[in-house]
Regions:
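Feature marking well-ordered beta-strand scaffolds used for ligand recognition
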Residues: 1-171
Length: 171
């Protein structure tokens, strides 16, 4: 399977035959700006997406995370549009061990507790560019939470790379 985040819509494709991919389903999100990246929960039941341009275009007022239910691949259902607390343009997110690690450009990395995958809750953040605010495309670009040590890498376009580790029992 291939899960495509294609700007204005979400597409699920069967790519068994690489020369002839078949569309299984296409779904659209309300007020889409530019949806381009997402990540599956470990059980593959939910797909989390960020929209990079919805805030810049004025479609929403804070960072929006889309949560799709993939129980029926022929009919994915948008079950939540989680709204963050900051007016941050979102870029990339990755899920690991019940948390979503989001690169939110000028507001750094935000961490969501997704132990209840249909109802995310903000759990923490690290601001890579405290001198920048508002929507825009500078600051935290991506995260990598997959080191066995628990260290999380956050890359920031102007500031470089940050290696972070949460405090014990912080969230």
């Amino acid at each position: 399977l291939c899960l495509n985040s294609n700007g204005a819509y979400f597409e699920i494709m069967d790519v068994t035959d690489k020369a002839n991919p078949q569309t299984i389903s296409t779904a659209s999100s309300p007020n889409a700006g530019y949806i381009h990246q997402g990540w599956l929960t470990d059980d593959h039941k939910y797909f989390y997406q960020d929209d990079e341009a919805d805030l810049v275009r004025g479609s929403v007022e804070t960072t929006r995370t889309l949560v799709w239910d993939l129980t029926d691949l022929e009919d994915p259902i948008l079950i939540n549009e989680f709204m963050g607390t900051m007016p941050a343009s979102a870029h990339n997110l990755y899920l690991k061990d019940g948390f979503a690690y989001q690169a939110n450009y000028r507001y750094g990395m935000h961490v969501l507790d997704i132990t209840d995958p249909e109802n995310p809750v903000e759990a923490g953040f690290f601001d890579t560019s405290p001198y920048l605010e508002g929507p825009g495309f500078s600051g935290a670009w991506s995260t990598y939470p997959f080191f066995e040590s628990g260290t999380v890498l956050v890359t920031s376009l102007q500031e470089g790379a940050f290696l972070l580790r949460k405090k014990k029992d912080a969230f």
